[in-house]
């Protein structure tokens, strides 16, 4: 089985897919066999305009789109609502089986979530699935993507503490849109670490991922 990490974020449009692509490319460039999987994806009229396709192109991944994504919805809503409207609800068994199949082909796996950590994937009378259920079913640790700017202390600490309350392992945080010599960004980094005990294992500056190389291996454990 591949070593895997679940990538979530402090909210929508924080840069989760963007950073997933940077991590995948970073590892691919190092000669590591990296794969990508996303259980449910919404707001995609065409696969070439999807999160998974972006990561696939960024890191030159060879897996097919169907291997990388189990459920794709056209409506740009939370997956649970898009699934209700389009009549194709996710099933946790299908998700686990699809993940295990692509997992076998790689040494490392990135599993990307949808939106923030409290995101309903399915919510109906038959089954209720949240991101935390997928993480537990796949039994993998998580990485949180957060914005470097104003308000991130609150959103990052709340995300970490919520995940801890659900007994989910958090292996680190990456700050996106970080600016050097920005005292607020520097302080945000320090405060998140001090308030939670979770390390900021990387930052993204002008589209460049700054990642401590010694963290890349432990990130997936």
From Swiss-Prot:
Amino acids binding ATP: 13-18, 51, 112-115, 176-177
Keywords from the named record: ATP-binding, Biotin biosynthesis, Cytoplasm, Ligase, Magnesium, Metal-binding, Nucleotide-binding
Domain of life (superkingdom): Bacteria
BP terms from Gene Ontology: biotin biosynthetic process
Compartment(s) where it occurs, according to its Swiss-Prot or TrEMBL record: Cytoplasm
Family the entry assigns: Belongs to the dethiobiotin synthetase family.
Protein name (database record): ATP-dependent dethiobiotin synthetase BioD
Source organism: Brachyspira hyodysenteriae (strain ATCC 49526 / WA1)
Lineage of source species: Bacteria, Pseudomonadati, Spirochaetota, Spirochaetia, Brachyspirales
């Amino acid at each position: 089985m591949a070593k895997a990490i679940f990538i979530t974020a402090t909210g929508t449009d924080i840069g989760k897919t963007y950073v997933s692509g940077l991590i995948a490319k970073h590892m691919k460039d190092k000669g590591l066999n990296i794969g990508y999987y996303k259980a449910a994806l919404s707001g995609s009229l065409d696969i070439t305009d999807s999160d998974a396709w972006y990561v696939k192109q960024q890191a030159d991944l060879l897996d097919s789109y169907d291997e990388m994504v189990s459920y794709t919805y056209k409506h740009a809503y939370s997956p649970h609502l898009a699934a209700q409207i389009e009549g194709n609800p996710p099933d946790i068994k299908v998700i686990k089986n699809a993940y295990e199949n692509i997992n076998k082909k790689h040494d490392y796996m990135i599993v990307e979530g949808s939106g923030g950590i409290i995101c309903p994937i399915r919510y109906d009378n038959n089954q209720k699935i949240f991101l935390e259920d997928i993480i537990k079913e796949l039994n993998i640790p998580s990485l949180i993507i957060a914005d470097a700017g104003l308000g991130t202390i609150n959103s990052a600490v709340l995300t970490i503490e919520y995940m801890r309350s659900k007994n989910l392992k958090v292996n680190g945080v990456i700050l996106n849109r970080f600016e050097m010599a920005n005292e607020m960004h520097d302080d945000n980094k320090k405060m998140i670490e001090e308030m939670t005990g979770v390390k900021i294992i990387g930052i993204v500056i002008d589209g460049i991922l700054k990642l401590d190389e010694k963290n890349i291996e432990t990130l997936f454990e």
